[in-house]
Design a protein with these regions (language model features):
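Carbohydrate-binding surface patches
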Residues: 1-9
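C-terminal beta-strand-rich structural cap/linker in extracellular carbohydrate-active enzymes
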Residues: 25-52
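Extreme N-terminal, non-catalytic leader segments
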Residues: 51-76
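Conserved lysine of the Walker
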Residues: 85
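Hydrophobic positions on the alpha1 helix immediately C-terminal to the Walker A/P-loop
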Residues: 88
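Conserved nucleotide-sensing/catalytic segment adjacent to the nucleotide-binding pocket
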Residues: 104, 111-170
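ATP-dependent NMP and nucleoside kinases share a basic, alpha-helical "lid"
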Residues: 175-224
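Small-molecule kinase domains that catalyze NTP-dependent phosphoryl transfer to phosphate-bearing small molecules
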Residues: 226-266
């Protein structure tokens, strides 16, 4: 392990090569583990970036919570695919855990009707049969997303239930399952999802919109290499159509995280 110096103990840092996140306190006191040595003398290079927008967002959210009387709140982080939702949501969760607040991070990617590969096939089928207007009427709607299922999760959380059934979706056929999850002691539910600002989603107390552009999301999707067709013309057009809808849904946001990292009210 190598310990770092001069960091902010309460801040969250992103290690750029691995994508892992660490608190400043952990890096200074416990350190970062080194990979196994393959030869006698070996050099390693790490690059850490402070996720400043996460700290700023945390402060804004805490100010909002001070005026909120609910014991349990749902905060959604929504934006384009590859806009940084997962990175920001994970860092925000760490801030809550650091101050002793029970916080659960839920991914909306578990709630389409079909696994990603089959959903892409359905998107293509809709496009071939009904054109771009048909595709626009499919993306992010109840035809693509099981909004009833995720709305039930948010309703159960608000009702104070300590055990809630969550859905888990893999990337291959048959990889869809349900699991009872313990929510006792959880007062903040973070939902990170492209469709977290949809009018069909009910139960969100504070929607947070992440600004992005199709060009940026394309670059990030390719870089993270989650899907083989991330750079295909069809998927790029899907991302553009989703971005059109997101620009309409930004009106639902209580807070906006700008491309420059600034956090502001609309």
């Amino acid at each position: 392990y190598v310990r770092l110096r001069g960091l902010k103990p309460d801040a969250v840092y992103l290690e750029e090569q691995s994508g892992r996140q660490y608190s400043g306190a952990a890096l200074m006191h416990a350190g970062i583990p080194l990979p196994p040595f393959t030869r006698e003398y070996e050099a390693y290079q790490f690059a850490f970036t402070e996720l400043k927008e996460a700290g700023t967002l945390y402060e804004k959210v805490q100010k909002w919570r001070d005026g909120n009387v609910k014991n349990r709140v749902v905060i959604s982080l929504y934006g384009g695919s590859g806009s940084g939702k997962t990175t920001l949501a994970t860092a925000l969760q760490q801030y809550f855990l650091n101050d002793g607040t029970g916080c659960y991070l839920l991914s909306g990617d578990d709630y389409p009707h079909r696994i990603p590969k089959r959903n892409d096939e359905e998107r293509m089928r809709v496009y071939k049969e009904t054109g771009e207007d048909g595709l626009r009427g499919y993306l992010g709607t109840k035809k693509e997303i099981d909004f009833d299922r995720i709305n039930e999760v948010l309703a159960a959380f608000h009702e104070g239930k300590d055990t809630i059934t969550l859905r888990h979706m893999g990337r291959e056929d048959g990889e869809i399952s349900s699991e009872e999850t313990d929510f006792s002691g959880i007062s903040v539910l973070l939902l990170e999802w492209t469709h977290g600002g949809s009018d069909d989603l009910h139960g969100v107390d504070l929607p947070v919109f992440l600004e992005s552009s199709p060009e940026e999301t394309k670059e990030r999707r390719i870089r993270r290499n989650r899907d083989e067709n991330a750079a295909s013309p069809f998927i790029c057009r899907v991302v553009e159509l989703e971005q059109e809808k997101l620009e309409v849904q930004r009106k639902n946001a209580g807070l906006i995280v700008g491309k420059d990292g600034r956090v502001y009210e609309p």
